[in-house]
Amino acid sequence: MSQGNSVRTLSGLQRLLEGGLIICCVLAAYILLALTSFSPSDPGWSQSHFQGDIKNWTGAVGAWIADILLYFFGVTAYIMPIIVASTGWLLFKRAHDLLEIDYFSVALRIIGFLLLILGFSALASMNANNIYEFSAGGVAGDVIGQAMLPYFNKLGTTLLLLCFLGSGFTLLTGISWLTVVEKIGFVSIWSFKQLKRLPQALKREHETEDTRGFMSVVDKFKERRDSQHVLDKAKARQPAETPSRVLHTRAIPEESHEEFITEASSGKGKLSSLVKILSFNSNKAKDEPKSQQRVEPQLDQASAVAEYGHFEAPPWVAKSHDAELDDVDTGLNAEFFEDDDGDEPVFHRETMIDEDDDTLSFNDDDVIDFDTKVSAGAVTQAQRQKQTPKAKIVDGIVVLPGQEDKPVPTKPMDPLPSVSLLDVPDRKKNPISPEELEQVARLVEAKLADFNIVATVVGVYPGPVITRFELELAPGIKASKISNLANDLARSLLAERVRVVEVIPGKSYVGLELPNKFRETVYMRDVLDCEAFSQSKSNLTMVLGQDISGEPVVVDLGKMPHLLVAGTTGSGKSVGVNVMITSLLYKSGPEDVRFIMIDPKMLELSVYEGIPHLLCEVVTDMKEAANALRWCVGEMERRYKLMSMMGVRNIKGYNAKIAEAKVNGEVIYDPMWKSSDSMEPEAPALDKLPSIVVVVDEFADMMMIVGKKVEELIARIAQKARAAGIHLILATQRPSVDVITGLIKANIPTRMAFQVSSRIDSRTILDQQGAETLLGMGDMLYLPPGTAVPNRVHGAFIDDHEVHRVVADWCARGKPQYIDEILNGVSEGEQVLLPGETAESDEEYDPLYDEAVAFVTETRRGSISSVQRKFKIGYNRAARIIEQMEMQGVVSAQGHNGNREVLAPPAPKHY
């Protein structure tokens, strides 16, 4: 069957829900018809006799239902159809929430519903007339009203019942009465304003209709003739050596006038309407011969600064400023023209064109006669200037009235960003109860017994994402037996994944970690508010998330001192890196911590561009990344020499010595300064050294492009940079042995593994299994330095817009001071080279290089073995000669089969 003829069928749950919706809607309509067509003579629950035909439209069953509802609830029974239909609709639309029922909220809604129904019934019973032969409030209303009247009288009972209604509404809907009052006030004020503007709008519309046909062909011809006459007169009077400023006024067609009035009266497009009134164009004067022109006298030097060019405005906008706001209500609020006090315009400039300026002197001939009725509001140019809001020039740019300048972000007063920049989390507590945990514990014991494993659950620790069950095994049962059954246990327990913790430090139990049915999100704001982060004195304090029991996990990068992060795509690795960087921004300023960020993907770390913590721009070119790592090696060596001369062991001791000298009023000069290195007559004073954090988002891409030299640079930094205050955070989504090599792992003991695809990847990053059983979305295994047992941590979540807020807050505090040598490289004499590495300029060609080139070009064979046999040299020497030929373009690079093509022609033979 073709795909076009196939019909998508519903699943079992969808069929049930859609069928339930249809049943509820039909039942609601049935009850409504039964109540509407109720007759007291029909058979019912409240009467036993029956004579004649049934008048109810829904038959005897409908008559019975209507009789019961009216008997018990009175007029409140007419609400029942709405309740039935709403229940069916909610169950149909929110079926995915059925499994996440908050029983406490459901109980509150039921209580609110009962308060509403019973309170309304009691009020109807006390104040409304009977309906048919039943009480207006039914039996329920009569019982409640008669029980309360002897104690509270009618007024007190009414107040209490109104209290029931208000409380029931809040409990049922969750809507605050303060919000209701606020919305009612807003609607009332808006309605009052609309009613106040209605007479003016009707008056304006009436005037527009009366004058719409006033413009005739003769008037248009007269207007065009007068405009040309004025233009000729102005040209004759204009001095040749000093061009005067021409102010252009362009006639707007009636369609534009009507469109503007329609749009303005509707209150929309305030800024666009204002631009229609005041639009500047300095390039259309020569292209519009039909436009009206008025030559103004030459301004003096002070007023000539405000050169406006050509001013275009509809000639029908001609009333005064007050008249425009009152009579021609264009929908523009006064805030576009005046400030909050309403006394002066928002925009000010001394060079603004003003009709009251003493430098402007008009002759009688300078005023254009606008006697022709271009439109209903056509008046003279001088009157139009009086009512038009003035424009200004800021830095050579014309700013229209109503176009407010973008607010310049003010520098925050606090030394560090506020936690209020992060969103307030919408916390949803885990609805699992102790009884359910007990049932799961018994189920775990039963499933283990199915595999002949006798174990007892001695502890249950529920967390935001997983729950750990601690098992006490029977004598003689190995923990590895449970580990081998992890997949079978996950299948039998209907769990996504099961992780077995064979060793729990300090306990003799085995841990079994099961994912929760409802997963909670760990928000960064919750973790930043903890005391462990706020009270930490280290400038390199970072937050990771929460552990399996919900406690925040706070670490110190200075004690790690380097971190290796790995995880597959979508496991939460990039979010984890952002959380660590943001927590450092919340803890330290640029005087304490500086960053070098390397982002081969050009997406993850570019958001931090512009923060004052950066030592250079975010590196996206991998050649510049190699230079940045070389600079770090050079800076590390410089700091080591400086600390050695200062007699301190690490950067902490160095900064303490500098701070102590400043407190005592002493100055410590740079002991490494040489007069030949600077133009200054004396050595500069030493200052505090910040810690440097190098963040590499995708380490595998950098190694693929730059090569193995990156591995050597990173290994050298990782070996020695701790005391110098330089720390590495390396992240990769390909945790293979060719990326995370043994040299890197040996020098970076701190690891962080997110979800990986196989056990091999887990062993590569952690040297043990476990990362393949993680749940993703920030679920990680954190291996602290000096330990062999990883801790399971649920990573904190921070959204992109929250990161943008923190970055904008730091950008408002200052600009970064970049060091150009980081990306461009250092001078040749100061180039940092690894052991055994030589600079390109220092490379010497082999003495046999010329002979080898002649041999290769003549024989057209560019293999290492041929050069080795010809000149009887070792393999390494022959390989270096071939590599030099490749660099010089003599031979090509190796192909897929290992062969090289000889590119250079043979040397010419001399006879």
UniProtKB/Swiss-Prot annotation:
It comes from Shewanella oneidensis (strain ATCC 700550 / JCM 31522 / CIP 106686 / LMG 19005 / NCIMB 14063 / MR-1). The lineage of its organism: Bacteria, Pseudomonadati, Pseudomonadota, Gammaproteobacteria, Alteromonadales. GO terms for cellular component: plasma membrane. The chain crosses the membrane at residues 16-36, 64-84, 104-124, 131-151, 161-181. Residues 550-763 form the FtsK domain. PANTHER family: DNA TRANSLOCASE FTSK (PTHR22683:SF41), SPORULATION PROTEIN RELATED (PTHR22683). It is a multi-pass membrane protein. Keywords: ATP-binding, Cell cycle, Cell division, Cell inner membrane, Cell membrane, Chromosome partition, DNA-binding, Membrane, Nucleotide-binding, Transmembrane, Transmembrane helix. ATP binds at G570, S571, G572, K573, S574, V575. Residues 182-911 are cytoplasmic. Its main location: membrane. It comes from the Bacteria. This is DNA translocase FtsK. Residues 403-427 are annotated as: Disordered.
